[in-house]
Swiss-Prot record:
Gene name linked to the record: nahO
Protein name: Acetaldehyde dehydrogenase
Residues engaged in binding NAD(+): 12-15, 158-166, 276
Family: Belongs to the acetaldehyde dehydrogenase family.
SUPFAM superfamilies from the UniProt entry: Glyceraldehyde-3-phosphate dehydrogenase-like, C-terminal domain, NAD(P)-binding Rossmann-fold domains
Originating species: Geobacillus genomosp. 3
């Protein structure tokens, strides 16, 4: 019985390269067979070859030519994934989408991964979504969240061409994620690229307005969620205790909790300041491993 599942990474930029190192760093059920880009001179492809991974500038066509690849991590762009999704589905390959395209259902590992392990396309929302939606969900499972707002500040140096092309998709998809997964009646997302040098760590301010909530229960739920995310993103942490207040909000005067979150990257390929990219690749690996394990179990019982 096969104990691994062959996977490929589509996109050889910062995110694709960091994901490659994460998969190679701890080999379990994912067998990285290929990394495919479109630029023959890509640093990511050169690094893949140096690690003994088959690298090609043939893009999605190269991946589709290999029937043994069962899972594809798409680390390109939202517009590109809209084209890739249909072709991957037709080829019977599971797509784990690291762009804001949102063709498949939104997935945040500690919140709803197990609900979607059987889907042929899952979407990891955005870096800001992976960072802040768990906290909004932590409040919504013990209170009625009327409004959630997040401001994500990331180092400008960590935002490559793909990130910059996806700014509009980022705000829309993250806002929807705060609602659909986080449980807020209304969500709002803002991203800021900070050019400071040395680069700052990813910082997120999360503002949650709620009804029918107990401070102690909310604090406990948030603490448990922080612990859950740290299992795959060790650098995920609050900068201080939750701040409770009562304020005027877009939904009227309500109780609010304000959270200051910092994400430090693991430094597998990207600098530790690129926590915004690290949380995406760590989440992708987590999702890929769970889906791969299910595929193995299905094969063993067939």
């Amino acid at each position: 019985m096969n104990r691994t599942v062959k996977v490929a990474i589509l996109g050889s930029g910062n995110i694709g390269t960091d994901l490659m190192y994460k998969i190679l760093k701890k080999r379990w059920v994912l067998e990285l067979s290929m990394i495919a880009g479109i630029d023959p001179q890509s640093e990511g492809l050169a690094r893949a070859r140096a690690e003994g991974v088959y690298a090609t500038a043939g893009g999605i066509d190269a991946i589709l030519e290999d029937p043994e690849i069962k899972i594809v991590f798409d680390a390109t762009s939202a517009k590109a994934h809209l084209k890739h999704a249909k072709r991957l589905k037709e080829a019977g390959k599971v797509a784990i989408d690291l762009t804001p395209a949102a063709v498949g259902p939104y997935v945040v590992p500690p919140v709803n991964l197990m609900e979607h392990v059987d889907k042929d396309n899952v979407n990891l929302i955005t870096c800001g979504g992976q960072a802040t939606i768990p906290l909004v969900y932590a409040v919504s499972r013990v209170a009625n969240v009327k409004y959630a707002e997040m401001v994500s500040t990331v180092s400008s140096s960590s935002a490559g061409p793909g990130t910059r092309q996806n700014i509009d998709e980022f705000t829309f998809t993250t806002s929807r994620g705060l609602e659909v997964i986080g449980g807020a009646e209304k969500g709002k997302a803002i991203i800021i690229l900070n050019p400071a040098k040395p680069p700052i760590l990813m910082r997120n301010t999360v503002y949650i307005a709620y009804e029918d909530g107990d401070d102690h229960q909310i604090r406990h739920s948030i603490g448990q969620m922080i612990h859950d995310v740290q299992q795959y993103v060790p650098g995920y942490r609050l900068k201080g205790e939750p701040i409770f207040d009562r304020r005027e909000t877009p939904k009227g005067r309500l109780d609010v909790v304000i959270l200051l979150l910092e994400v430090e990257g693991a430094g597998d390929f990207l600098p530790v300041s690129a926590g915004n990219l690290d949380i995406m690749t760590a989440s992708a690996k987590q999702v890929g491993e769970v889906i791969a394990k299910r595929l193995i179990e299905m094969t063993s019982t067939a």
